[in-house]
Amino acid sequence: MIISNWKTNGTQADIERWIKEVSKKIEYKNRTECIICPPSCYLNSARQSINKINSPIKLGSQEIYSNQQGALTGGINAQMLNDFSTEFVLIGHSEQRQYLNEGNTSLRLKLDSAIDAGISVIFCIGEPSNMKDDESTKSHLKDQLSVLKNTDLGSITIAYEPIWAIGTGLNAGIKHIESIHSFIKVYLNTLNTNKNISVVYGGSVKLDNSEEILSSNNVDGLLIGGASLDSDTFSKIYNLS
């Protein structure tokens, strides 16, 4: 699974062009999903572009409102996402945890809303810079992962993104990534009997470090931000998977 998270970047034309170019450049592998998460206002346009050329790219949302309907200006709910045939949704990204004060209770409501609607979840976790030692990191991640208790993990992918590595150019290092991904998989198996839990890595992923990260048996894919906006760079990273 290789995911392009556009955040609040790009225009409709940029995204349509990206879909066309990536669809031509990637050496699509049935077992490696290629996902674009554009801004919500471009979900419909992205879906139309994907369908028009019968692209293997799958569509993801950056957000989901926990209720089916309600008074949340700017919200987007599961029914709306299904109208665009949205296959994935990001939940728990550190930027939303930080800037929108999202906690475990609201994240669980979003999680349930997505699963009930048949939308696969990419659940994001990660530690801040003051918790970079292994024990503090693991304790923090356990708390974040507690949201998944009593949940069928079959439609959930974990995205490990250390907060201090997002958009900073700092990479966690392959030994740290392998250690934390292994910990996540072992810990989740204590919450659920699903033995095929996928864990992808995010945080300053670039073309020059992606091959090493993907070479780890504990890494099942990548969640890429800024580097993914360039179709050529993203396609080259995907083709390494």
Model feature map: region roles:
Residues 1-241:
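Active-site loop-to-helix "anion-binding N-cap" substructures in soluble metabolic enzymes
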